[in-house]
Amino acid sequence: MMPIKSIVTLDQLEDSEYLFRIVSTVLPHLCLDYKVCDQLKTTFVHPFDILLNNSLGSVTKQDELQAAISKLGINYLIDTTSRELKLFNVTLNAGNIDIINTPINISSETNPIINTHSFYDLPPFTQHLLNIRLTDTEYRARFIGGYIKPDGSDSMDVLAEKKYPDLNFDNTYLFNILYKDVINAPIKEFKAKIVNGVLSRQDFDNLIGVRQYITIQDRPRFDDAYNIADAARHYGVNLNTLPLPNVDLTTMPTYKHLIMFEQYFIYTYDRVDIYYNGNKMLFDDEIINFTISMRYQSLIPRLVDFFPDIPVNNNIVLHTRDPQNAAVNVTVALPNVQFVDINRNNKFFINFFNLLAKEQRSTAIKVTKSMFWDGMDYEEYKSKNLQDMMFINSTCYVFGLYNHNNTTYCSILSDIISAEKTPIRVCLLPRVVGGKTVTNLISETLKSISSMTIREFPRKDKSIMHIGLSETGFMRFFQLLRLMADKPHETAIKEVVMAYVGIKLGDKGSPYYIRKESYQDFIYLLFASMGFKVTTRRSIMGSNNISIISIRPRVTKQYIVATLMKTSCSKNEAEKLITSAFDLLNFMVSVSDFRDYQSYRQYRNYCPRYFYAGSPEGEETIICDSEPISILDRIDTRGIFSAYTINEMMDTDIFSPENKAFKNNLSRFIESGDITGEDIFCAMPYNILDRIITNAGTCTVSIGDMLDNITTQSDCNMTNEITDMINASLKNTISKDNNMLVSQALNSVANRSKQKIGDLRQSSCKMALLFKNLATSIYTIERIFNAKVGDDVKASMLEKYKVFTDISMSLYKDLIAMENLKAMLYIIRRSGCRIDDAQITTDDLVKSYSLIRPKILSMINYYNEMSRGYFEHMKKNLNMTDGDSVSFDDE
């Protein structure tokens, strides 16, 4: 097993930088057949976050989410009606969840292990929950997070100093509380819902039931607050003919509405007098104790299970006054009836009895083990193989549960190990990027890579890479387009087509296929000269330059015909022009045809409105073109050549240009909120992709899996086979540090450059000796024989020497450029990348020399000064009449 302390996590990185590190460092170490555990493909998000933003729920298990919402609704009602708990820092209103500023009973110093993580990448309520979980007790965090213990599963009973009521049943409390369309009444606890513009029937019936216990004086105010008159008309209820209220506790048909009055309205409206057997009740507490005991008689034993200290008696004493106003104390004792005293917290116990009643007629929620709350046993975690350990620690927040002073706490697992405490369980929270869990993205990316075919890029069909003109005709047409002045759109189209037809008539030879380097320029020039609006967008996808050209209006045969007819052409004349210019028009209407089924989504993410032939209205022609980036452009040559120490070499990202583009693409995918593994795969540069993909598309051997399968019973004759497997695995799957190769490769270029300049100097000296002898002969002829050698002969000799030095320097430049390219290719090959299809051009040689030139400038200057010295020496000895007629020019 890999030592826990040596595992490197990525907790402090976020968004595109984090995802880039995962793809570039973790993904290459996974086999293509690596299977991501299904439990890790989803994560935990606090229900409050999801209720405010439904899209956040896409990364959670729906059954777990529904269970958490139900449980959280119960816990919220318990917390908000209790005088002791006060653990929630929010208040739920119609359509919104508001943060409250009043103190809550949560401590940031309870956990002995200090938390230093912020979790800014999490939604606000999930982040708040996680901070509570890592600073307070695990029990309180589970209460706030809506935890439900799975039945018959491997889970942990957390320890806590004090525990709260644990009710578990299916409900819609949170949805009811957050229902947006409610009457804006003074009493916020009772939410009267509006359905189709009118008070809901259920709430109307309950309010009518409560209304009978409100005094005559307060009823108008009550009716106005809840629009009772409008609702009564809607439901056909005559408020004036309602039966008189039954206000005697002995004959009252139901205590429901009287309890509701005590629960919600007692402090806002005055209540009518309540009687017991004709005697007027004197105390509100006795009324609520009697009614609550009678209504929820069967639930009192269940209440006592949760609150053993609550007073429960077999009788109740009611203080009343008879009709003559004499005090009468009535002791009520009924067979098999208990009376509970809830006066210490009426609101809480009325609410709790309602919860117990709902539980009695509902089904309990069944859930499976949660990786976020229950996790796995620590021993199970330690027994995981290298790949699983690396994958989990890089894609998930990893927590541990431990006990301290008979209380269970949760902290970052590495912090627990550092504090030298013993974890009991390990909990995982898969991270989310761009609306998907990173674990799921990695799974999709591996699947996309495994199912890929040989790489293809959008390549133009060769049959439409010409306009039917020979090379001479094409060049004439190309130059003619450059001369086209700004003219009206219709006129420009007609003139270009007629010019083409004129050139076509006298043109001979096979069609000239447009070269890829001039294709985009020709497209732009052709359509712009015709008056089309042409715009170009360029970017990088993977290791390819992407060009997207949009042409407005859309180019079709019908549009061309209609445009020609607008320029005084008859339909017949327009058809003749089109027939004569068939190859040109076929090229024009076919430019948007490209093939690459793997890149459709890739381009859609670049320009969403350009997918499938342009905008929804079909007003544009879209041309997509992709060309591989040259080798030197993929490499950070400036960073390489500016590094002078080993540390600087190691800090250099060799493939910085394409990696930077990859990060930008990841950032855009994340912002879209619709990132997929296919997106990552399409945007992945070769330097990463080639470290994952092996020849023939087969997966390499997983060292971890292979070592797991080796047992003491393995045949000793398998030693050589196992050794070969290990060597092959190390060769194909172990990531090599590219930067360690740079110093060795590039220093060799400088050394070879010095060696080659010495060789060049020797050869130049030998050749210069011939010119020196020639100059000596001319000097002898003029000095001894007094014969005059013309300046043209002398100048010709000096020009030949200049040509010799130019050729020598050109050969030297080509040699150094090749040496530099060889060093670059050496770096790429040793980095595990494939360069079999690389094609080196003259431009690459020029660029290669320009990159290495600053490092060898002193040697070049030395050679130039040496050559200049020879030139000036010969020129002086030749004694030319016009000495300024020829001079030595260097670079």
From Swiss-Prot:
Q: How is it modified after translation?
A: The precursor is cleaved by OPG083 to give rise to the 62 kDa mature protein during virion maturation. Proteolytic cleavage of major core proteins OPG136, OPG129, and OPG098, which occurs at a late stage of core formation, is required for production of infectious mature virions (MV).
User: Which Pfam families does this chain map to?
Assistant: Pox_P4A
- Propeptide found at 615-697
* Site-annotated residues for Cleavage: G614, S615, G697, T698
What molecular function does GO assign, one term? structural molecule activity
Assigned keywords, A-Z: Virion
The answer to whether UniProt assigns keyword Lyase to this entry is no
InterPro entries attached here? Answer: Poxvirus_P4A
Q: Where are the transmembrane segments?
A: none
Q: Which GO terms describe its cellular component?
A: virion component
Q: How does it assemble?
A: Interacts with OPG129.
What the record says about family reads: Belongs to the orthopxvirus protein OPG136 family.
State the protein's purpose.
Core protein 4a is the most abundant virion protein. Major component of the virion core that undergoes proteolytic processing during the immature virion (IV) to mature virion (MV) transition.
- Protein known as: Major core protein OPG136 precursor
Instruction: Give the originating organism.
Output: Vaccinia virus (strain Western Reserve)
Question: Which taxonomic lineage is given here?
Answer: Viruses, Varidnaviria, Bamfordvirae, Nucleocytoviricota, Pokkesviricetes
